[in-house]
Amino acid sequence: MMKSTDIIRYRLHNQQIAGTKLRNPLEIVERLGAVQAQDYSGGLWGIRLRLPGSKLVDIEKALINRKIIRTWPMRGTLHFVPARDARWMLELLTPRVIRRSAGRYKELGLNVDE
């Protein structure tokens, strides 16, 4: 059985919080797949936490240069994702979000097909 300290160490490593070898915001977001960014500054912090010595401008530069974009591929929640992955993520996940929102659409008098 694993010790709780080992579990904590593995989680920190796998989440790129400790011991990362990644060098820039894009590599972090690619490795994680997405970073939750419903709160913009919280999303920036989530990336910066994983890049010791990085500056906010480094992350914002990746956004300005469209290496990373902020979109809502999962659960209707905003995330930072690699720009080159956004299309397939949205194509894969949007139908599920729409299905799960059907009740709310009906309440609002919206038609999914419109």
Could you describe each region identified by the protein language model?
Residues 1-114:
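Phosphate-backbone binding and catalysis cores of DNA-processing enzymes
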